[in-house]
Amino acid sequence: MRPLETEYKDWTIRVITRSTGRAWSALVEVWVPGKSGDKDARLVPYNVTSQSEKAAQETGRIAAVRFIDAEAAKG
């Protein structure tokens, strides 16, 4: 499946899933508004496995939303 790319509060979110044998994990990246490209990506802490690729995408996106909200709370 292609990476899931969405937006939240003008941030860009990309979730890249990968199979880990019987489960799925993901690499989760975000970009602040106005930034793009791999050099501007920020990695989101995410260390969860899921039973399906779709579930890995969903939980990865949830982790990104929490990360963005935490960054916004810092001011």
Regions found by a protein language model. Give the residues of each.
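N-terminal segment of the canonical double-stranded RNA-binding domain
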Residues: 1-36
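Acidic, low-complexity intrinsically disordered segments
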Residues: 40-75
